[in-house]
Amino acid sequence: MKISDVVVELFREAAIYLPEDVKNALEEAYKKESSEISKNTLKAIIENNKIAEETQVPLCQDTGVPIVFLKIGKNINSSEIMKIIEEIKEGVKKATEEVPLRPNVVHPLTRENFKTNVGLNSPFINIEFDESLDREIEIIAFPKGAGSENMSALKMLKPSDGIEGIKNFVLETIANAGGKPCPPIVVGIGIGGTADVALKLAKKALLRKIGERHRDKEIANLEKELLEKINSLGIGAMGLGGDITALDVFIEIAGCHTASLPVGICIQCWADRRAIKRIKLDAKL
């Protein structure tokens, strides 16, 4: 199977099927929710997902912008990497037509629609190298809707603001977002690096499965504390008030300048869509 065909199937899977961990988290949220209106909203979300699977149509009308996380193993040369990138672009074009995906990607100033979700650096491909893979690549399709993406935030805190400053910024951001990102949400937080790195870490944090804690115990405890505090805000499903505002909180960190404390926040809606595939490359790509 060509890489472009794999990309089509990954975006089809991501658009139609929620990952099992997300489905289970929504079911748990439904059981725990005490607000009748939020409980009914969660019930509607769960039923919506079943209908999407049965009818093979995307589970949300906003099929997002196409984001790809690409891991490249060893023994893959630069010309092969360029070929892989072209195959990913071709796959996004085909997926837009075949799944179908809504053609969301437009010119930022003229608002001209590219019709294919490909153009001006889209799809957005994040590349990293992994020596544990030998002539293998890993592709994660990660469609991202506008409602949650528009609630992203970045703040360059003072180092003296410390952990309390980070907590306050996160809670202020979620409180101000309210129902706009279509809760129950998943919250990705990037701490450290530079401004751009913090936001990239926050986006990457959203790739984790619900319940998957950070390997550093201190960070893991901060994730749990923030989840509890966010759910105490009472925003509830779709902002209608309730116990469950977030399904999980994930944090990623990086070293930063001694005079900086960047914090990036990326929010994912209840439709926490992602699909992953590893591919062993042929002798000649």
UniProtKB/Swiss-Prot annotation:
GO terms for molecular function: 4 iron, 4 sulfur cluster binding; fumarate hydratase activity; L(+)-tartrate dehydratase activity; metal ion binding. Keywords: 4Fe-4S, Iron, Iron-sulfur, Lyase, Metal-binding. The keyword Metal-binding applies. It is an enzyme of class 4 (lyase). The keyword Lyase applies. One of its GO terms (cellular component) is cytosol. Tetramer of two alpha and two beta subunits. Belongs to the class-I fumarase family. PANTHER family: FUMARATE HYDRATASE-RELATED, L(+)-TARTRATE DEHYDRATASE SUBUNIT ALPHA-RELATED. This is Putative L(+)-tartrate dehydratase subunit alpha. The lineage of its organism: Archaea, Methanobacteriati, Methanobacteriota, Methanomada group, Methanococci.
